[in-house]
Amino acid sequence: MPDAKTKTTDDKVIKSEEQWRRELSPIQYAVLREKATERPFSGEYEHDHRAGTYVCAGCGNVLFESDAKFDSGCGWPSFTQPAVESHVDEERDVSHGMIRTEVLCAKCSGHLGHVFPDGPGPTGLRYCINSAALKLEPK
């Protein structure tokens, strides 16, 4: 989805904050660029059960497959694993008085959500992801 003013470096998408603001909705910008969190149970994909591939709303990077999605009851779309491990980055997050693992898009560094070690098999992980960070490409 890069436009003429978008730079890519080693598969990274680099845009100015002005470009991001123009291209993303206000909630997408807040989540992806400012690390905001949607209110629980408010996101577009929380109860969406269509088959497909979830890509980054900022850059189109493939992130999760619908067959890895499960209902965790936490209020955000949850997945057991990324579609491609190298398409997500994880960083330690000590904001808000908590210690968590933040999940970011490896291509555009957009904030996606957090991963927790309380999910079902096969991984035991729960990738708790903001709907605003995702775009579903139905199969």
From Swiss-Prot:
Q: What class of enzyme is it?
A: oxidoreductase
- As recorded in UniProt, its EC number(s) are 1.8.4.12
| Domain of life where this protein originates | Bacteria
What residue stretch is flagged as signal peptide?
A: none
**Which chemical reaction does it catalyze?**
L-methionyl-[protein] + [thioredoxin]-disulfide + H2O = L-methionyl-(R)-S-oxide-[protein] + [thioredoxin]-dithiol
Which residues does UniProt mark as catalytic? C128 (nucleophile)
Q: Say which family it is in.
A: Belongs to the MsrB Met sulfoxide reductase family.
In its UniProt entry, what is this protein called?
A: Peptide methionine sulfoxide reductase MsrB
Q: What organism is the protein native to? A: Bradyrhizobium diazoefficiens (strain JCM 10833 / BCRC 13528 / IAM 13628 / NBRC 14792 / USDA 110)
Read off the lineage from the record. Bacteria, Pseudomonadati, Pseudomonadota, Alphaproteobacteria, Hyphomicrobiales
Gene name for this UniProt entry: msrB
